[in-house]
A protein has these predicted regions:
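NAD(P)+-binding Rossmann beta1-loop-alpha1 motif at the extreme N-terminus of oxidoreductases
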Residues: 1-43, 50-51, 178-180
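Rossmann-like NAD(P)(H) cofactor-binding subdomain of soluble oxidoreductases
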Residues: 21, 27, 37, 45-120
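Small-residue helix-packing motif on alpha-helices
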Residues: 20, 30, 48, 183-190, ...
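Short pre-catalytic strand/loop immediately N-terminal to key active-site residues, enriched for Gly-Thr
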Residues: 103, 152-157, 209-214
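NAD(P)-dependent Rossmann-like dehydrogenase/reductase catalytic/cofactor-binding core
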Residues: 192-255
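Internal alpha-helical scaffold of NAD(P)-dependent oxidoreductase catalytic cores
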Residues: 91-101, 117-154, 167-204, 249
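Short acidic-hydrophobic, aromatic-tinged amphipathic segments that line or gate anion-handling sites
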Residues: 40-45, 145-147
Length: 255
């Protein structure tokens, strides 16, 4: 996801290539990043953090303690944006004493096409300028909301895991089309574009999804027949249950 963020920042002309420094222990990945974006690269986290004003922590959760042990003492003068799954503001503060300007972010995979949804939770030490900077960074790859940190598990269950639910829904819609005689490629395009267009209509119209649904469902028509089948299958309850299950699992993993 850090690559997607870098790409979004550069595409949006929010910074220049020489203003980004990516670190990675694997030389081949550094070479690829340099070739792809023209940014500074290296394997020394300390050098990069010493140079930076904003640090994005984008490592696997199990690697975070080692990374913070290496650079924790240098983080007290920078704005820290963490996209490390499950790592709380408190845990980062405890592993990097003196660091207070911390933002916890939960982006999702559509950031790779700059249509992501990111939730931000701000540490107590963040200024209004820090909050504005954090929003700008993640708006480069989609939309942004601010939440209390206690709601991050629910964010994980909804927008974090949500793309997978939607992928499965698109697959099921396409399979339904194929079952009714449509060619596979055509069915997948119809399904994916329908989901994309419906989502855009919700966002841009500002209307409740139920109102938009009712406009499509004519009395005795095809759409209401399909909706009736979804109700019989427990469609809404199943989706709500998926969000609940993923939220609870996120809570378990965070303990």
């Amino acid at each position: 996801m850090a690559e997607a963020i870098a790409g979004g920042l550069l595409a949006g002309k929010l910074c220049k290539p020489d203003q980004l420094w990516a670190t990675d222990p694997v030389a081949a990945r550094c070479d690829r990043l340099k070739s792809q974006f023209g940014i500074r690269v290296g394997s020394d986290n300390h050098d990069a953090v010493t140079w930076a004003e904003i640090v994005i922590l984008a490592v696997k959760p199990q690697s975070l303690p080692e990374v913070l042990k290496e650079i924790g003492a240098d983080l007290n003068r920078v704005l820290v944006l963490s996209i490390v799954a499950g790592s709380t503001l408190r845990s980062i503060r405890e592993q990097a004493p003196g660091t207070s300007r911390i933002v916890r972010a939960m982006p999702n995979t559509p950031v790779f096409v700059r249509e992501g949804m990111t939730a931000l939770a701000f540490g107590a030490g963040c200024s209004e300028d820090d909050m504005s900077v954090a929003r700008t960074v993640f708006e480069a790859v989609g939309r942004v909301v601010s939440v209390e940190e206690r709601l991050m598990d629910a964010v994980t269950g909804l927008s974090g895991s949500g793309p997978a639910y939607v992928f499965q829904a698109i697959e099921a819609l396409a399979d339904g089309g194929v079952n009714m005689g449509l060619p596979r490629q055509t069915a997948e395009l119809l399904a994916a574009q329908t989901v994309l267009g419906a989502a855009k209509l919700v966002l841009e119209s500002g209307e409740h999804p139920a109102k938009l649904k009712d406009r499509v469902a004519s009395p005795g028509g095809t759409t209401i027949a399909g909706l009736h089948q979804l109700e019989q299958g427990g469609f809404r309850a199943t989706l709500m249950g998926a969000v609940e299950a993923a939220t609870k699992r996120s809570q378990e993993l965070g303990r």
